[in-house]
Amino acid sequence: MFTLTQLCPTPLENARQLHLSLTAEERCRRRLHCHSDEGESLYLKLPRGITLQPGDRLRDEDATVIVTVHAKPEPTLKVMASTPLDLLRAAYHLGNRHVPLEIHTDYLRLGADSVVQTMLEQRGLTVTFEVAPFCPERGAYHAH
């Protein structure tokens, strides 16, 4: 088992390279037992305040392994609107409910939630279930 304790801003040439696919919720956890995409047993033991993003690299204390983080496909809702203003209003209502949200110019993505889906559909938005990588916006006061 490799214990990953810190971010690695630059690649290390001699370290073993692994990949780790995590859901949006898992990327917020400081402590997590998991397996790399290659099947290696991993333990995340990260400092407070770290929210992992796709492309982040983690390393163990000895720098024997570097693990690149990826967004794991998960159940999501893709929200589309007939006008940009309707999409903006949807983002407002979702933000007002503190719903983690991935924002694009022509659609929004959020974790699958039937109650929120119903609310959005009642507002006339097109909501589609998709299994896709989910990368919600980080908070305005987040520092990485």
From Swiss-Prot:
The keyword Cytoplasm applies. Gene3D superfamilies: Urease metallochaperone UreE, N-terminal domain, UreE, C-terminal domain. GO terms for cellular component: cytoplasm. Its main location: cytoplasm. One of its GO terms (biological process) is protein folding. Keywords: Chaperone, Cytoplasm, Nickel, Nickel insertion. One of its GO terms (molecular function) is unfolded protein binding. Coiled coil: none annotated. It is found in: Cytoplasm. InterPro entries: UreE, UreE_C_dom, UreE_N, UreE_N_sf. Belongs to the UreE family. Involved in urease metallocenter assembly. Binds nickel. Probably functions as a nickel donor during metallocenter assembly. This is Urease accessory protein UreE. The lineage of its organism: Bacteria, Bacillati, Cyanobacteriota, Cyanophyceae, Acaryochloridales.
